[in-house]
Structure formats: C-alpha cells, structure tokens
Swiss-Prot record:
Record-stated family: Belongs to the tetrahydrofolate dehydrogenase/cyclohydrolase family.
GO molecular function annotations of the record: methenyltetrahydrofolate cyclohydrolase activity; methylenetetrahydrofolate dehydrogenase (NADP+) activity
The protein's assembly and partners: Homodimer.
Entry-linked Gene3D superfamilies: Leucine Dehydrogenase, chain A, domain 1, NAD(P)-binding Rossmann-like Domain
Keyword terms: Amino-acid biosynthesis, Histidine biosynthesis, Hydrolase, Methionine biosynthesis, Multifunctional enzyme, NADP, One-carbon metabolism, Oxidoreductase, Purine biosynthesis
EC number(s) given by UniProt: 1.5.1.5, 3.5.4.9
NCBIfam families assigned to the protein according to its UniProt record, in alphabetical order: PRK10792.1, PRK14186.1
PROSITE patterns with a match to the protein in the record: THF_DHG_CYH_1, THF_DHG_CYH_2
Entry-linked InterPro entries: Aminoacid_DH-like_N_sf (IPR046346), NAD(P)-bd_dom_sf (IPR036291), THF_DH/CycHdrlase (IPR000672), THF_DH/CycHdrlase_cat_dom (IPR020630), THF_DH/CycHdrlase_CS (IPR020867), THF_DH/CycHdrlase_NAD-bd_dom (IPR020631)
Gene behind the chain: folD
Protein name: Bifunctional protein FolD
Disulphide-bridged cysteine pairs: none
Pathway: One-carbon metabolism; tetrahydrofolate interconversion
Organism of derivation: Histophilus somni (strain 2336)
Pfam family, one: THF_DHG_CYH_C
Length: 282
C-alpha cells in the first residue's frame, strides 16, 4: 500500500490562519501588531527567494515587517550594531538574519548577539539550551515544523526509533532534541557514520536533512516507516528531495513530498514564533 502523504502545504495554511486570527484579536483590543525585522546581507538568489516568502507571509498575517537589505560589503561590526538597535526597539519582537552570511562575517557571533527573546529562528545557544533542558521557548523553525507534521500522522512517538541523517545546527541537532523530548530513541548520523544503510533500515521515523539529491535509496527504508524529507535540491529544472521518493513511498507508511512537505512549515513556524515572542514581550 502506497504511503500516505503528509502535506506541509495544508498544515502550514492552518497554522498561519490561527496566527492571523490571534493577531486580529490583539489589534481589535487596540494593541500593536507583532514586529519582525528581516536582515539580508548580500544578493544570494536563494536567500532573496526565502526572504521574499517570509516577508509576504508577514504581510498576509498582519505582522509588521521591517526589511534590511544590506550590501555584501557590510562589515560584521555594522551588522552587530544594527542587531543591537533592533534588540532595543520595542516595536520589534523578532529578528531574523538570513543565513548563510558572507564568509567574512562570523554567523555564530551574529546569532549570539540577537536577544534570546527575539531569536525567532531558535538558533541562539540560550534557546537551544532550554530545549536541551526540556523547557523550550523559541524553537528552531524546521524541527518544530516537522514535529507538527508528525503529530498529524496520529502515530504515538513514545519508544519509536528515530534516525536523523545530517547533524547541522539548523536541522539535525535541534531535531534530535525535539524527538528526544517526544519520547523517541534517537540516532543521529553524519559524514563519519559507518554503514549508513543499516541505520536507515532500523528507522521507525527517518528525518533526512543533507541537501544531496536522492542520497537515500528507497529500498533502504524500513517497511511502515515515517519518512520526513527536508532536502530541497534542483535537478534538471525540478525540485527533488534527499530521498528517492517513488521507491520510498512504496515502503513507508507516511512520507513528506518535495516540494510541499517540510518547506512551507518552516515559514509557518517562523510566523508562529514571532507571535510567541510578541506575546512574551506584551
């Protein structure tokens, strides 16, 4: 039996609708709108697309969005000074610095400079630490979106063996913490992992976030597994994931498509986090 599709497109619409509804409620009470500052350094085409989609979502939902498109020559100190100003701005609840940054700018230093209460990307060590301590506040958008997708399957996550392919700070590592919090037994694989196939084959829940097209053959998937494909790769003009979708969907019980799976959830959770930050500041 073919896998059931987990649609991020549909779920993200519901989440955005709920966020917009809450914002309208606050506005009707005479309160200000939530504010999000979006900073883009340089003119990377992919980053421009992502930033554009975030700004459009803000407009749709009633979030006040302030844009800062900085030239590639911007120095690290100039960026840190801007972030400090935004940290002090009472109209701004969330600060988003689009990654990757130019090589000469230390992204870790930049992330650490954002006030933890305005870190709507959920990357600040304080917020990652809270998740690690099982008291999360602002959580990384993609892993949080994946947890929302997993909820829609109705599968009890307690005791499930979750395998994560990729150990990035943006997806893999916070994803491991989210799944631990949900009661899973978690394995994280990375570039030094030996016998990747055997790890994949043991996964009740498989999260793949590598950024390499079709790196996971469908035949590796365990019968009945839930497959979450975070990868977005362009091959011959088409967007494809990190998993061989056609084969994997014959073995999995649930699977996310690419596009229309995890991607829309990342932006939806950014809007959700911005509302959360606004509520904490109010």
């Amino acid at each position: 039996m073919p896998a059931q599709i987990i649609s991020g497109t549909e779920l993200s619409k519901n989440i955005k609708f709920n966020v917009a509804e809450k914002i309208q409620h606050y506005l009707q009470q005479g309160k200000r709108a939530p504010g999000l500052a979006v900073i883009l350094v340089g003119a990377d085409p992919a980053s421009q697309v992502y930033v554009g989609s975030k700004r459009r979502s803000c407009e749709e939902l009633g979030i006040y969005s302030k844009s800062y498109d900085l030239p590639a020559e911007t120095t690290e100190q100039e960026l840190l000074t801007l972030i400090e100003q935004l940290n002090q701005d009472p109209q701004i609840d969330g600060i988003l610095v689009q990654l990757p940054l130019p090589e000469k700018i230390n992204s870790t230093k930049v992330i650490e400079h954002i006030s933890p209460t305005k870190d709507v990307d959920g990357f600040h060590p304080y917020n990652v630490g809270r998740l690690c301590q099982r008291i999360p506040t602002l959580r990384a958008c993609t892993p949080l979106g994946i947890m929302k997708l997993l909820e829609t399957t109705g599968v009890d996550l307690y005791g499930q063996h979750a395998v994560i392919i990729g150990a990035s700070n943006i997806v893999g590592r916070p994803m491991a913490l989210e799944l631990l919090l949900a009661g899973c037994t978690v394995t994280v694989t990375h570039r030094f992992t030996k016998d990747l196939k055997s790890h994949v084959h043991q996964a009740d829940i498989l999260v793949v976030a590598v950024g390499k097209p079709h790196i996971i053959p469908g035949e590796w998937i365990k019968e009945g597994a839930i497959v979450i494909d975070v990868g977005i790769n362009r091959v011959d003009g088409k967007l494809v994931g990190d998993v061989q979708y056609d084969e994997a969907s014959k073995k999995a019980s649930f699977i996310t498509p690419v596009p229309g799976g995890v991607g829309p959830m990342t932006v939806a959770m950014l809007m959700f986090n911005t509302l959360l930050a606004y509520e904490s500041h109010s």
